[in-house]
Amino acid sequence: MSAHDLKLEEIVNPETLRRKLNELADSTDENYTSPTVRKVVLQALKDALVRGRANAEGMLMKDGGGTLCAKRLSFLMDTLIEALFEFATTKAYPMINPSKAENMAIVAVGGYGRGGLAPGSDIDLLFLLPYKQTPWGEQVVEYMLYMLWDMGLKVGHSTRNIDECIRLSREDMTIRTAILDARFLTGNRELFKTLVTRFDEEIVKDTGPEFIQAKLAERDQRHRKAGETRYLVEPNVKEGKGGQRDLHTLFWITKYFYRVKTKEELVKLGVLSRAELKLFNKAEDFLWAVRCHMHFATLKAEERLSFDIQPEIAQRLGYTAHPGQNYVERFMKHYFLVAKDVGDLTRIISAALEEQQAKHVPGFNRIFLTFSRRKRKLSADGDFVSENHRINIARPEVFKEDPVNIIRLFHLADKHGLEFHPEAMQSLTRSLKLINSDLRENPEANKLFLEILTSPRNPELILRRMNESGVLGKFIPDFGKIVAMMQFNMYHHYTVDEHLLRCIAVLSEIEHGELENEHPLSNHLITTVKRDRNLLYVALLLHDIAKGRPEDHSVAGARIARRLGPRLGLTPTETETVEWLVREHLTMSMVAQSRDLNDRKTIIDFADTVQTMERLKLLLILTVCDIKAVGPGVWNGWKGQLLRTLFYETELVLTGGFSELSRADRDHQAREALADRLSDWPKDKRDAYLALHYTNYFLTVSLEDQVRHAHFIREADRNERALATMAKPHTFEAVTEITVLAPDHPRLLSIITGACAAAGANIVDAQIFTTGDGRALDTILISREFDTDDDERRRAERVGKVIEDVLSGKAHLPDVLAKRTKPKRAAKAFKVEPRVEINNTLSNKFTVIEVEGLDRPGLLSELTGLISDLSLDIASAHITTFGEKVIDSFYVTDLVGHKISNATRQGNIRRKLLGVLSGENGSKTNGRSSQAAA
């Protein structure tokens, strides 16, 4: 990279800056260390810093060069520090006849030492001394540091002599790494040369394995902290997996082990090919560009690429929308592909290190065994060998001789439970061009792939290796299109390909009985569909494969399934089942969460879609895997209960047992089960309590929750409390349940949801029930905030207190809610087109109003309040939150119990609800609500 490319003269002119500092200092008769002189010198340095950064940002916007920007900012800092040091040693604290001890070198270390800086990066300096610190040295260091701090810079610093540097770097790996990146700035160059020579001879020499072990352990710990996967949709660009620090780690260990200074030397040594060096530089340039833009845009050292800044960074980088993908999603896909490239480079360098005697050191996520290599043939033709519990190729030409060996490598690794040898993965990466249409249509290759996908061992692990190596996306091109694809919303935590792999992992866990307690129904059903288990794995791999296209991904995905099924060896009937599962993969979740499961028509319509028990079982298991794999906290026990209820109700229809008698029988059994758990109650009290609840309560609420509710209501009655709340944290589901007992009235739901918003609680779900004596029993699920149950319970009790205060009139809802009307920071980044649908076909008795819009504090309260104002009764409400988006369904009638059939009235309802969703005039919250009996 030439000075011409950098255009450093547009950043700062070193000679002009030094001359200006001297002129400013000489323009006054005061001492050079006086406050007046210090002030003008500081201002000149600040001006140069601001001007240089502004020019660097402008050049970044123009040429897009991330590495160029980082080097320009580093040059700017070099110039400021060199000018400041010269001023400090020639003007402020000059030495006429310095002793040997009275000199120093200013050395850039750490990230700054590598010659690249982001706008908000720390400036790490080593004040290098020949011997002990002197009074003169203390004055210079102090003067420089305070000036740099007053410029608003974050400066990390150490003052050491050479002996101390050597001793400490021997003891402390962080210091050793910092000195590894040391770069001379100004001062006594001979001091710096001595340090470098001694460091290389006394520290680096013969300690390569030790250093590699430490840096890889440090990397693994960093990944655990930042998130193990490189496909988190809000990645940490600096510290996350596949981020900038991973590139730094790769260069550190190669620089240390091979004792090189530049990446280019690794090509000469055969560690990297020229293409791989180009990949390294491209990844580095992109990550620098993203990070510099983030710092410039936020005016701080922001390292997390969060939702709220992704749109601006994408615009700064020049991304535009394509059909099916907006500009943010295209930018983030590029980001994740770069993160994947970093993973590829990790494997390549790992192979080279092991080849160069690093095999006794913990490698990349596994141990290089210390005993000598023992090879064992894995295939009859001798193409593959087992080497220290890792699969390797027997010779370099294995993939070229027979491209099916590319798939066979993974099949054998799964069959024998082997890890992958770095040499095999390096050769594989360089053989991806062999995956062509002939291999894709090869029957044996597809048979092997299906066996990998449906392996009874750990299919997710092997598929992940196939994906990381690029094989999966090449072998199934439609999968390749969704690799690294993110969806710009707060609901999906991972990229699409990562989500699909996690779905496979969940299914495998269910099949192995590992999730019996959490998913009891799926755990049972999986044993009854063994004949079709392969179809589940195929459907899960394909269910989101058409994401990012202009059309409905379920419909497009079904077409892909129809095309791929025969290729994978499925029969026409099996292919049809997979196609159906992909097309309907969202249906069961949608019906369970946003429809009234106590409405007979809901069940009949769903049964008409499913048609057979076999499909019902498969769809239930697929739905559980899909929701579970979306991300932490998305699955919760209530969603499981809703899915189980829908399954059992539909089962009755499909098996011919759906009748009021069967429903009544199940109601009777549920009442008997609760009565048995309340056997210590007096019989009259027990019977009276059981009579309080309607059938839908017993068919929807789990027995354990029924018992809790019984004791809760009994305690409230004993204390003559008409109004009471109860909190229960759910640790695993990352939600907290608040149960509210209150006199029922039409505006209760609006008041409760408004009070939750006022208390800062984010509602993720709600259940609404009424009792026979005119009371409401409402259960609200809110997002968890604290790690410990005790802290979370106290917080939930505070939320419950706000609800009680508002319901009792002690607090005025509009007043307390007004303080909490700011939407979540991340939600501001999203746009959700408001939607209102009014449907009279989903229920025989009720009109179903379904609304969709951007979530905000108090929205549910506003919606239910408006519905009440429109003279509508809510029979049931079903609240579903998908990240920043809400989809709420209300089963309503007019005040005399009829559906809303008048088109003019429907239009008025739709218009006013759209106003609330858009935040327009209809969105004033005043605690209004309407009856919400499930």
UniProtKB/Swiss-Prot annotation:
Renumbered to this chain, region (Uridylyl-removing) spans 380-736
The residues covered by the HD domain are: 496-613
Underlying gene: glnD
Please list the cofactors this protein needs: Mg(2+)
> What PROSITE patterns does UniProt report for this protein, alphabetically?
ACT, HD
**Which reaction(s) does the protein catalyse, per the Swiss-Prot or TrEMBL entry?**
[protein-PII]-L-tyrosine + UTP = [protein-PII]-uridylyl-L-tyrosine + diphosphate; [protein-PII]-uridylyl-L-tyrosine + H2O = [protein-PII]-L-tyrosine + UMP + H(+)
Q: Which organism is it from?
A: Brucella anthropi (strain ATCC 49188 / DSM 6882 / CCUG 24695 / JCM 21032 / LMG 3331 / NBRC 15819 / NCTC 12168 / Alc 37)
> What disulfide bonds does the UniProt entry report for this chain?
none
Per the entry's comment, what about the domains? Has four distinct domains: an N-terminal nucleotidyltransferase (NT) domain responsible for UTase activity, a central HD domain that encodes UR activity, and two C-terminal ACT domains that seem to have a role in glutamine sensing.
Q: Which Pfam families match?
A: ACT, GlnD_UR_UTase, HD, NTP_transf_2
Record comment: activity regulation: Uridylyltransferase (UTase) activity is inhibited by glutamine, while glutamine activates uridylyl-removing (UR) activity.
GO biological process, alphabetically ordered = regulation of nitrogen utilization
UniProt-recorded Gene Ontology molecular function terms: [protein-PII] uridylyltransferase activity; phosphoric diester hydrolase activity
> Which Enzyme Commission number(s) are listed?
2.7.7.59, 3.1.4.-
Q: Is Signal one of the keywords UniProt gives this record?
A: no
Q: Which UniProt keywords apply?
A: Hydrolase, Magnesium, Multifunctional enzyme, Nucleotidyltransferase, Repeat, Transferase
From the Swiss-Prot or TrEMBL record, give the protein name: Bifunctional uridylyltransferase/uridylyl-removing enzyme
Q: Does the record bear Translocase in its keywords?
A: no
The UniProt record lists the ACT domain at 737-819, 848-931
Q: What is the protein's known function?
A: Modifies, by uridylylation and deuridylylation, the PII regulatory proteins (GlnB and homologs), in response to the nitrogen status of the cell that GlnD senses through the glutamine level. Under low glutamine levels, catalyzes the conversion of the PII proteins and UTP to PII-UMP and PPi, while under higher glutamine levels, GlnD hydrolyzes PII-UMP to PII and UMP (deuridylylation). Thus, controls uridylylation state and activity of the PII proteins, and plays an important role in the regulation of nitrogen assimilation and metabolism.
Provide the family line: Belongs to the GlnD family.
